[in-house]
A protein has these predicted regions:
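Conserved donor-binding/catalytic core segment of Leloir-type glycosyltransferases
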Residues: 7-9, 178-207, 218-221
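Donor nucleotide-sugar binding/catalytic pocket of nucleotide-sugar-dependent glycosyltransferases
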Residues: 133-175
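Nucleotide-activated donor-binding/catalytic signature segment of Leloir-type glycosyltransferases, i.e.
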Residues: 231-252
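Short alpha-helical donor nucleotide-sugar binding micro-motif in glycosyltransferases
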Residues: 251-252, 259-264
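Aromatic "clamp/platform" in nucleotide-sugar-dependent glycosyltransferases that forms part
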Residues: 272
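Short hydrophobic beta-strand element within catalytic cores of glycosyltransferases
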Residues: 289-292, 302
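A short, well-ordered alpha-helix in the C-terminal region of glycosyltransferases
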Residues: 328, 335, 342-356
Length: 377
């Protein structure tokens, strides 16, 4: 029996971010590739993380080149289904709108896998509203969490939505992990140094903790971006008197990155907006309690009061206007810094949830099931 042909149009590294990592997992999946006749086009135009979401003439030429590459692949492969990981808002959405509409004109059956959110923030703009109506018409949608349906419900029926959370491969040195008990607890920030990740609010929270006499070591792992330069970051640390308890290590990958997880006691991610960050899953795998903003689909991973603490209230926040409160961050961190038993309990709860729901094996089986259903629609 002939396998169904699927053309995967998705982001793969470089640059390295959540969506590109998941794209690479799909590309390398033995189960997915053995279940279908798979063909791939890398949707990424930016090769540097700081260029993601930016415009410019050079980027525009890259978009046109990518559009022609997609068109050529469709004509050559003649797929039964096209899987694409487009953007939901802003300049990247306008670029992907053209690609999706071209696929529809070419008569393709399309399933879109959203690794981001933002539709609700733009749906009241007349142009975006018009584009969204055409963008979502006649397609199926894969979301990272049930909570994210709120972002697209104006345009997509619930029966046309599938949920497939992010996942990560098992890390050998996280197996049989023991929860850390550093004499001075280490708080791990492992994402890029960006204002939209809540870096300033987090630094303010650390200042509050230090002023209260709390003992901690804050480790920062991640790349610098145009949102915050190295000089600006250093200046903020100096201004708040945090140089003695904060260390910046730059971006780390592979075993170098995992060593920071294995040495940490608490993981923090006070972002303004997220969909379903892979870094939270990595923290859960290493049995770290998580303090994170309750934005997007974060609550699908972190259970408030069970495997960590959610910032901003009990209900998932979809709008990008959210800003974390430094005092709330400080309060949640102080609870974990002073209660070793609670850190252990929450960390192990997160680890157990990771093993049940977020391993790569679970993801692959779920993705094969979703793709099989969509090939038939």
């Amino acid at each position: 029996m002939m396998k169904q042909k699927i053309l995967f149009i998705m982001h793969m590294p470089p640059p390295v971010h959540g969506a590109s990592m998941v794209g690479q997992f799909i590309h390398d999946s033995q189960l997915i590739n053995s279940s279908f006749d798979c063909h791939y086009v890398n949707l990424a135009v930016a090769t540097q993380l700081e260029d993601v979401g930016k415009g410019g003439w050079h980027k525009a030429k890259g978009v046109m080149k990518k559009l022609m590459e997609v068109r050529k692949a469709v004509k050559s492969v003649k797929p039964d289904l096209v899987y694409i990981t487009p953007n939901s808002a802003g300049i990247p959405f306008y670029k992907d709108f053209i690609t999706v509409m071209m696929l529809k004109v070419m008569g393709q059956k399309v399933v879109m896998h959203f690794h981001n959110k933002g539709v609700e923030t733009r749906q009241d703009k007349w142009l975006d509203n018009w584009m969204y109506k055409h963008y979502f018409k006649g397609v199926k949608l894969i979301l990272l969490a049930d909570a994210l349906y709120e972002d697209v419900k104006k345009y997509v029926k619930r029966e046309d939505v599938f949920v497939c959370p992010n996942a990560i491969p098992a890390i050998s040195n996280a197996n049989g992990v023991t929860v850390n008990s550093n004499h001075v607890p280490h708080i791990l920030w492992l994402t890029n140094i960006m204002k939209t990740k809540g870096i300033m609010e987090y630094l303010s929270a650390l200042k509050i903790l230090k002023d209260k006499g709390a003992k901690f070591q804050a480790d920062f792992v991640g790349g610098l971006t145009k949102e915050m330069s190295g000089d600006e970051f250093d200046s903020a640390l100096s201004m708040m008197g945090l140089n003695g308890c904060c260390t910046y290590y730059g971006p780390k990958y592979g075993d170098d990155k995992y060593s920071f997880f294995s040495q940490a006691d608490v993981f923090v991610l006070p972002s303004y907006t997220e969909a379903f960050p892979v870094s939270i899953l990595e923290a859960m795998q290493f049995a770290l309690p998580v303090v994170a903003s309750n934005v997007g689909g974060v609550s699908a991973g972190v259970e408030d009061g069970v495997s960590g603490f959610l910032l901003g209230g009990k209900l998932p926040i979809m709008l990008n206007t959210f800003r974390p409160d430094a005092c709330e961050i400080a309060d949640k961190l102080q609870v974990l810094l002073t209660d070793t038993d609670l850190r252990h309990k929450m960390g192990l709860a997160g680890r157990e949830k990771f093993e049940r729901e977020f391993t790569l094996e679970v993801f692959e089986k779920r993705m094969v099931e979703i793709l099989s259903n969509n090939v038939k629609y």
